[in-house]
Curated annotation (Swiss-Prot):
Keywords: Nucleotide-binding. This is Nucleotide-binding protein AHA_1129. GO terms for molecular function: nucleotide binding. HAMAP family: YajQ. It comes from the Bacteria. Nucleotide-binding protein. PANTHER family: UPF0234 PROTEIN YAJQ. GO terms for cellular component: cytosol. Belongs to the YajQ family.
């Protein structure tokens, strides 16, 4: 029986490349001349440091642009609040890895409400979709791509 998995993963090596590009852009921008500001990747999160809160907001936009250039959707970012310590401001950006239980339930409900002849089952942090026809699976993929679920979805293990 044909099947595929719906997952939500962010490639951390692409995030590393985006952070490097953002640091390079930060070094060349005129409005950051003479300002100590940096992006730093720690495992699953990016730490932003700057002298002022408005600079952090600009840095988040620089990071968003760098991530888009590396084909990472902005909906995978979870931007935290800025924290002031001493004369520096810090902000942490985390990335959503895997599908949460609530999002998985919404996804299964969306697929079942569409009346497409497929079955969806939650398996840990991914959703497995099985059906009798390949066309039904492709229709389900189009449905999931068009849905606004708050994080990007990828499809893996398409088996015929």
């Amino acid at each position: 029986m044909p099947s595929f998995d719906i997952v939500s993963e962010v490639k951390m090596n692409e995030v590393l490349n985006a952070v490097d590009n953002a640091n390079r852009e930060l070094a060349t921008r005129f409005d950051f001349r003479g300002v100590e500001a940096s992006f730093e990747l720690n495992k699953e999160e990016v730490k932003l440091e700057a002298d002022a809160d408005f600079q952090l907001k600009q840095m988040v936009e620089i990071l968003r642009a760098a991530l888009l250039k590396r084909n990472i959707e902005n909906s995978s970012m979870d931007v935290g609040d800025s924290v002031h310590s001493g004369k520096r401001f810090h902000l942490t950006v985390k990335f959503k890895q895997g599908i949460d239980k609530e999002v998985a339930k919404k996804l299964v409900k969306l697929i079942k409400d569409s009346k497409i002849k497929v079955q969806a089952a939650i398996q840990g942090d991914e959703v497995r979709v099985t059906g009798k026809k390949r066309d039904d699976l492709q229709e389900t993929m189009a449905l999931v791509r068009g849905a606004e679920l708050g994080q990007p979805m990828q499809f893996q293990n398409f088996r015929d």
